[in-house]
Amino acid sequence: MASLSESEGTNRGSMWELDQNLDQPMDEEASRLKNMYREKKFSSLLLLRLAFQSLGVVFGDLGTSPLYVFYNAFPHGVDDEEDVIGALSLIIYTLTLIPLLKYVFVVLRANDNGQGGTFALYSLLCRHAKISTIPNQHKTDEDLTTYSRQTYEENSVGAKIKRWLEAHAYKRNCLLIVVLIGTCTAIGDGILTPAISVLSASGGIKVQNPNMSTDVVVIVSVIILIGLFSMQHYGTDKVGWLFAPIVLLWFILIGSVGALNIHKYKGSVLKAYNPVYIYRYFQRRNSDSWASLGGIMLSITGTEALFADLCHFPVFAIQIAFTLIVFPCLLLAYTGQAAYIIAHKDHVADAFYRSIPDSIYWPAFVIATAAAIVASQATISATYSIIKQALALGCFPRVKIVHTSKKFLGQIYIPDINWVLLILCIAVTAGFKNQSQIGNAYGTAVVIVMLVTTFLMVPIMLLVWKSHWILVVTFIVLSLMVEIPYFSACLLKIDQGGWVPLVIATAFFIIMYVWHFCTVKRYEFEMHSKVSMAWILGLGPSLGLVRVPGIGFVYTELASGVPHIFSHFITNLPAIHSVVVFVCVKYLPVYTVPMDERFLVRRIGPKNFHIFRCVARYGYKDLHKKDEDFEKMLFNCLLSFLRLESMMEGYSDSDDFSVPEQRTEGSISNAFLAEKTNNNTMCSNGDLSYSSQDSIVPVQSPLRGNSLLRYSSQASHTVSDELEFLNRCKDAGVVHILGNTIVLARRDSGIIKKIAVNYMYAFMRKICRENSVIFNVPHESLLNVGQIYYI
């Protein structure tokens, strides 16, 4: 392989070297002095306040589990007191091992600068190994202040894992498949959580009216669900302050009722805290005990949402809220319910509501319904965030995303997804009509997401944390010791409702994987079809055409090279704009890109060609908002670049460095090859960087007061002329040139690929948002260039 690469290098010739000099990707000249990410420090009072607020956002789903756990564990009733004790013991130690130890004290630490969820874990891995979803990244992206990653010694475990992941494409593809499975199943949670929470809370109506039909409860639940999803476009900004008090009141209620029932009925239920009763439970009930695990597992539903909703609060605040309020109240609630069920074995179906004293029954019903709505809202919001992350990383069709709050960036609303969730949620609620089958479906979804998180934590601990292998093995053993039995129990209930999340996850997986596959293949086609810069510059300053006044923004996913649509454009039209800017908008595996680091601008070729490249970088949390004028931002970037470029040319330490304004076609190659050794000449001051022909300046960066830059009169005159020329071109008109491509499978492709590309991907592209809408391009300034890509 070495000899082959060497022979290729010798055969490339001077034209290849010229192309590399003229149009290098945004390379090391774009490096900047970074402000390292530092975790914010909070005062004790602020931490307590944030811990209180986290109750309404993070813990609603986990807190409403006592509404339906015991019924799903014993759908056919309870025969023996020991069964209840054994089930309670399982609940206690499941809550201890999974939410408390695994998530609160381990997984929450694996956040991406405060962002949680499956894609946050994946973005961490993408930064520490070259496994990004779309291969248009470059090493300059690593210079972002939010692009933190570790370095490894050559023979360390982390370095070996990194090389193993990067070695073959199929390994990276398998990792992506695992991430998509977890993501799609988490989306299923956004359907099942509102269904089971609202249906369980509404069931309290029937407890006081035994003769009431089950259909009435279902109708009430559907009405609540319709109201909940219909209000999503208003956002939670105005009513969000109510969530924390409601959930706190809920935890106080279930904790107090639990303590009352322990005192009133069987205090001996406390022996369930002895794990020996878990062994006795399985020994006595055999296969029945294993089947009941599917219901017991519902006691930890909402745990994954605890991680997914992490972005709103610091880790320590969530740890305080869970250990001081959530965990003790849940233990009291389940223990009190167990005591009540032992005394009233025939009330297991409605154990929660029947255990409430009559004097506070209806206030408790109102609080339970409100808590169920809050829990559903938190899961729906988490689903929006998951889809936004998937969309940013090229794994979901471009759907409309709406900001619902001017204060909080994370509060979004996705109309198309909202109505899909509503339809599926109503179908599940009205179709099953009871908690048992929905619970079976819910349990299957939850345990799959947890298994995916466990799997992803292994490379996180080795690559990111550099943990000792003994700690990694301990984490895996303790996690799988709980999750594998629960997963096997859920598989036993596939035919009793467990198939629902599998069908939902499969449908979303097909959509996401087909979209990602075709997006990557389309990018690879563009890479292979890109035009050499040497060829473009060989056409001369006029590009062999008439240069008409105006600015042309040519949008492309390529961070280097000239897209094929541009050569197609100049081949079929006799004119091109006086100023051409290749615009690349790309998302990186970071949660956000600061505004002062978002744009990178460089000049391509000699000045009289007036060709530039602008790369706009976004994180998966960033959004293109409607009030952003993308065209204005791009133009300001160009102006800033020209001013800073002129400053660097006039710098006193660069006297023997010059940028020729004009070169003849024949002199371009020799001049650049002669200057190759000086091509990395760079003058930097703080966070401003510049080099000769490959000029890269991060715009919107603050200039330091002690700067030593000075103008020469000639440079000042030149930049004034160019700025004036650029403004005249803007006044003449700006045109946005986008590729209107049709993607088709090659004729020799298999039938599955043809169906995926020619029909599924084509349909999704037809119904999703166009780039012109995403970038807010005025219709009168839009020019589409049609092409067919065969992938």
From Swiss-Prot:
Topological domain spans for side Cytoplasmic: 1-49, 109-175, 237-238, 311-315, 381-411, 466-468, 518-791
Entry membrane topology: Multi-pass membrane protein
Record's keyword annotation contains Cell wall biogenesis/degradation: no
Topological domain spans for side Extracellular: 71-87, 197-215, 260-289, 339-359, 433-444, 490-496
An annotated GO cellular component: membrane
Major site of localization recorded for this protein: membrane
Transmembrane segments annotated in the record for this chain: 50-70, 88-108, 176-196, 216-236, 239-259, 290-310, 316-338, 360-380, 412-432, 445-465, 469-489, 497-517
Compartment list: Membrane
GO terms for MF: potassium ion transmembrane transporter activity
Gene Ontology biological process: potassium ion transport
Sugar-bearing residue positions: N211, N434
Domain of life from the UniProt record: Eukaryota
UniProt KW keywords: Glycoprotein, Ion transport, Membrane, Potassium, Potassium transport, Transmembrane, Transmembrane helix, Transport
Keyword set includes Transmembrane: yes
Family statement: Belongs to the HAK/KUP transporter (TC 2.A.72.3) family.
Function: High-affinity potassium transporter.
PANTHER family: OSMOTIC STRESS POTASSIUM TRANSPORTER, POTASSIUM TRANSPORTER 10
Full protein name: Probable potassium transporter 11
